[in-house]
Amino acid sequence: MPKALHQSWIDLSAGVPDDGSSIVRFDFSGTFSEGSHEGTVFAGRIEYDPSTPATEHHPSFAIYGQWPAPIVIIAVGGQVLTSAGAAVYDRVDDGRGGHFDFVTMFGTGEIAQQQQSFFELLFSAEDMSMLDGTQMPSARQLQDMPLKQVSFGTSDPADVISRGDLTLHPAG
């Protein structure tokens, strides 16, 4: 069995504009600490449009990053299909009369799911730098929370990235 993912959660709902008029962006970076990509740095950006109706059935929030960035899609309703397969995931109330569904995929076969309050995203309290050298600010002190996980698509533990350390902050 894969080791439990070491991940943390933080509530970023305060970063969503009240008027819903602008896209919220978060840059992220980190390093894989276990698995076949151990030590590899990844980085990317999250973009979220708070004006998108919460009840629409299409992805309204996604992390964009080049491999081996984690593939993270927060979708509204239904099922997410990825290049590695499909996953049914946890549904959470978004505080606006709708819901979000959380899927986090690491490597080739690791799915981590966690039901939390609106707009909580996994990351750890480590200092990281973006690939272009930009220094990330320190994350707040966080409390680790266990994640439910499902393993599929691989029988080789080396193919499963079982831990990701991630920092996240609002893009400038």
Language-model regions: role of each:
Residues 2-172:
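An extracellular/secretory-lumen and virion-surface interaction module
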